[in-house]
Amino acid sequence: MPEEALLKLYDEHHRLKLTIDPAAVVYVAADSNYINVHYLENGREKVFPVRNSMKSFEEAARRHGIVRCHRSFYVNPKHIRLLSRGKDGIIYTLFNVDEMGKVPVSKMYYDELARLL
């Protein structure tokens, strides 16, 4: 895979922390001062924490087709099986890999995400 096609994640001091095929990324979650990258490696879920903000991840996400679905989450639409409304009324993503859990989708981002599926 060409170097420019890889997703490169830097920490808050601009040090390279993770280089990954963007197709392997399932979702990214905010956790205090970290972003947790949930990705697949050999069919299994891995999580890699990077000390940085969602705002700083935004440009890299856009370049690689990873979209925001909530103030605390980005998702890769290629891994989404469907969008489902829970009993609590919240819309969630369900992924192709069941072990990945589910991620909330806010009303603000729903239309864009639904259009990509």
Short names for language-model regions:
Residues 1-117:
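Basic, polyanion-interacting recognition surfaces, primarily
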